[in-house]
């Protein structure tokens, strides 16, 4: 079976592309990136996954992202190397950003159409070359694609424009699950909320109905009871559960104290205290953001004020403190962050 790797943008159009591709492929792994260095980081992850895969046939699908010349050349060169190892790999980039025009003219696999959104390009391309898994899904998929197209190219008279605006805000503000710590879960959460739109597309007042129900739909998607639990508690419980599944990979040690390291979670007070209460084998919780700022929390088992002073030129309280990492190297890879923290702790 062909293995598909789908890299897409982090806005409504980008995620809608992946909602579409999941209707055509069973064996698919999705990745998302904003522009800049994250694109190269995700391409590297895909190539690494191919190198480790036992499959022999692959499709790399890139949507709603325009690669620069260096990124396109790197991807093509690496694919050629894999092909020499008897791996059948196809590349297809489907985009609509005019900034990719020059690169599109240099690579046959780079398709550019500035008149349609990426979701519509992806849908029409896949419909032409592959069979949809459930043909009945076209009854909601096609109008959903048209809705995304209307709002993405800002056709105010287009189909579902107002509903598309609600969806655009939904994607932008659905940050309950951190993208860097919970990549798959974050994506699946957004795709689930987007797919829920199929139940509203044909309602008379669809934009208002979906907008009114969205908060409740979010609670349900996060595994909570919308009539009995607050979003704060539902979100914290969901995140704590996911963090607990990562205990082995995210453990760090400072002297005789065991800590949990997260990256770019932000606003950790409620989450950290809940995590430490439910996981008493941990003495402290720490979160590092993209600028190297450190937040530390404890529950009486570790003096994080002293830890922060010794390791991060910071301070605060025994159970709540903060600091900053000197010479911090930003990364889109959690392992890189953890290695920096381990180096600091080992040298403290």
From Swiss-Prot:
Single GO term (MF): nucleotide binding
EC number assigned by the record: 3.1.4.17
Thermal characteristics: Optimum temperature is 30-40 degrees Celsius.
Keyword Manganese: yes
Functional note: Hydrolyzes cAMP to 5'-AMP and cGMP to 5'-GMP. Does not show phosphohydrolase activity toward various phosphatidylcholine and phosphorylated sugars.
Substrates-to-products reaction catalysed: a nucleoside 3',5'-cyclic phosphate + H2O = a nucleoside 5'-phosphate + H(+)
Species whose genome carries this gene: Helicobacter pylori (strain ATCC 700392 / 26695)
Protein's recorded name: 3',5'-cyclic-nucleotide phosphodiesterase
Keywords for the protein's UniProt record, in alphabetical order: cAMP, cGMP, Hydrolase, Manganese, Nucleotide-binding
InterPro entries in UniProt: DHH_sf, Nucleotide_metab_enz
Cofactor: Mn(2+)
Summary of pH dependence: Optimum pH is 4.0-4.5.
């Amino acid at each position: 079976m062909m293995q598909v790797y789908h890299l897409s943008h982090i806005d409504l159009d980008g995620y809608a592309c992946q909602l579409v591709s999941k209707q055509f492929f069973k064996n698919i792994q999705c990745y998302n990136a904003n522009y800049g260095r994250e694109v190269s980081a995700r391409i590297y992850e895909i190539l690494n996954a191919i190198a480790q895969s036992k499959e022999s046939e692959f499709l790399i699908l890139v949507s709603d992202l325009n690669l620069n010349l260096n990124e396109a050349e790197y991807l093509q060169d690496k694919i050629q190397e894999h092909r020499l190892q008897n791996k059948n790999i196809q590349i297809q980039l489907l985009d609509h950003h005019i900034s990719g025009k020059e690169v599109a003219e240099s690579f046959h696999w780079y398709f550019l159409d500035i008149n349609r959104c990426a979701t519509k390009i992806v849908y029409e391309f896949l419909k032409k070359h592959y069979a949809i898994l459930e043909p009945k899904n076209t009854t909601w998929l096609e109008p959903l694609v048209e809705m995304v197209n209307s709002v993405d190219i800002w056709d105010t008279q287009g189909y579902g424009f107002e509903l598309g605006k609600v969806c655009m805000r939904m994607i932008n503000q659905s940050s309950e699950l951190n993208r860097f710590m919970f990549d798959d879960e974050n994506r699946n959460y957004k795709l689930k909320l987007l797919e829920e739109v199929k139940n509203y597309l044909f309602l008379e007042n669809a934009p208002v109905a979906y907008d009114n129900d969205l908060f409740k739909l979010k609670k349900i998607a996060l595994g909570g009871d919308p009539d009995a639990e607050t979003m704060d508690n539902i979100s914290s419980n969901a995140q704590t559960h996911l963090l607990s599944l990562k205990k082995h990979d995210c453990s760090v040690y400072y002297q005789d104290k065991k800590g949990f390291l997260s990256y770019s979670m932000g606003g950790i007070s409620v989450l950290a205290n809940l995590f430490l209460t439910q996981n008493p084998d941990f003495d402290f919780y720490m979160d590092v953001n993209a600028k190297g700022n450190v937040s530390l929390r404890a529950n009486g088992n570790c003096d994080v004020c002293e830890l922060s002073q010794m390791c991060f030129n910071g301070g605060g309280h025994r159970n709540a403190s903060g600091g900053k990492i000197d010479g911090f190297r930003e990364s889109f890879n959690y392992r890189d962050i953890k290695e920096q923290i381990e180096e600091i702790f080992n040298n403290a």
